[in-house]
Amino acid sequence: MAYLLVFVGGGLGAMFRHFINTLSGRLLGTAFPYHTFFINVTGSIVMGLIAGYLAFKGGSSQHFRLFLMTGILGGYTTFSAFSLDAALLYERGAVGLAVVYVLGSVVLAIAGLFGGMALIRAMT
């Protein structure tokens, strides 16, 4: 049952990620990997919100956590795409953009996680 929950959640997360990828490409262009940047930051914020809620409120089942955190968020976020995008920027000669992308993604994702946890902590 656990594998099925992760499988279904992962499919949903991947579908939403694909939606964000295509939408950002249409709206913002493809010169900078806005799609992966947005996905990594928002995924970390949501993970922080969920982790904070579960840590302070508890009460959710392992199946729920597997479906939501491992499945949906695991399918939605990815640092393998992050690494590829950074390498592609570098390979294209956009070294400055690559540095901004890597530093911005890491700093904002970690800040988003702490922010999500702090928000839940303040609400409980």
Curated annotation (Swiss-Prot):
Q: Where in the cell is it found?
A: Cell inner membrane
Q: Give the UniProt keywords, A-Z.
A: Cell inner membrane, Cell membrane, Ion channel, Ion transport, Membrane, Metal-binding, Sodium, Transmembrane, Transmembrane helix, Transport
Q: How is its activity regulated?
A: Na(+) is not transported, but it plays an essential structural role and its presence is essential for fluoride channel function.
A GO molecular-function descriptor: metal ion binding
Quote a single Gene Ontology cellular component term. plasma membrane
One Pfam entry for this protein is: CRCB
Q: Which residues cross the membrane?
A: 1-21, 36-56, 66-86, 94-114
Q: How does it sit in the membrane?
A: Multi-pass membrane protein
Sorted alphabetically, the Gene Ontology BP terms of this entry are: cellular detoxification of fluoride
Binding-site residues, Na(+):
74, 77
Q: Which residues form a coiled coil?
A: none
Q: Which catalysed reactions does the entry list for this protein?
A: fluoride(in) = fluoride(out)
Task: Look up the domain of life of the source.
Answer: Bacteria
Q: What does this protein do?
A: Fluoride-specific ion channel. Important for reducing fluoride concentration in the cell, thus reducing its toxicity.
Among PANTHER family, the record links this protein to: FLUORIDE EXPORT PROTEIN 1-RELATED
Family of this protein: Belongs to the fluoride channel Fluc/FEX (TC 1.A.43) family.
Name of the molecule in the record: Fluoride-specific ion channel FluC
Its encoding gene is what?
fluC
